Amino acid sequence: MRFLCLHGAGTNGEIFEIQTGGIRQLLQKSGHRFQFMNGKINAKVQEELEGIVDGPFYNHYTRGTSPGSTVLEAFDHTKQFIAEEGPFDAVIGFSQGAALAAALLIHQSKTHPDEPPLFRAAVFICGAMPWESSGLEQIAPQPDTYPITIPTANIVGKADALFPEGVKLFELCEPTKAAFYDHGSKHMVPFDMKNTEEMVRVIEETVAKAIRG
């Protein structure tokens, strides 16, 4: 499959390429390919990366407050990238990138219900809760309602401050098609072999579900 890759806030596509190096190396052996998109909004670097990596750094939409119209702008920016660089079979996002992917999938299903989803599968790593297209409210899980209907791999870290949001993102996904893996660490993509192999296993199972339909 060909994956669109969406980085977290205050980073960029090149940093996300490094963060996902371990899992990509194994996934590429199965023929999967990855394309990285930068967010649209210039941003300050994530605090833990300051002085370690070079910029520029980006957000997909405004962070730290209700993002308002910048959510729709992020949708447009992403769809334009898909039109120019796609098509993509799947999406993989980290933190804000995961939230953007989820929000875009939900928005697209609401506004274009008769069209197929933008992606056949999604991988959410340390995901934040997605925002409504208005950028005024986050999309909270509702009983027996699953707006993300494609196969998903939901990868979280128990020691991550965003762990509760990652669980809520998982609860937005169709349960029969949603895999859940806790790597047990902080807000990161672990590099150790055990977690790398388990994350790849979960992603490959998600891809297989998408292929089976």
Predicted segments, located by residue:
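Serine-hydrolase catalytic machinery in alpha/beta-hydrolase-like enzymes
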Residues: M1-P87
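Conserved alpha/beta-hydrolase "acid-adjacent" motif
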Residues: E14-I15, A161-V167
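Gly/Ala-rich beta-loop-alpha elbow adjacent to hydrolase catalytic centers
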Residues: I92-A101
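A conserved short beta-strand
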Residues: P113-A128
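Short beta-strand/loop motif that positions the catalytic acidic residue
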Residues: P147-I148, A153-V156
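Catalytic histidine neighborhood in serine/cysteine hydrolases
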Residues: C173-P190
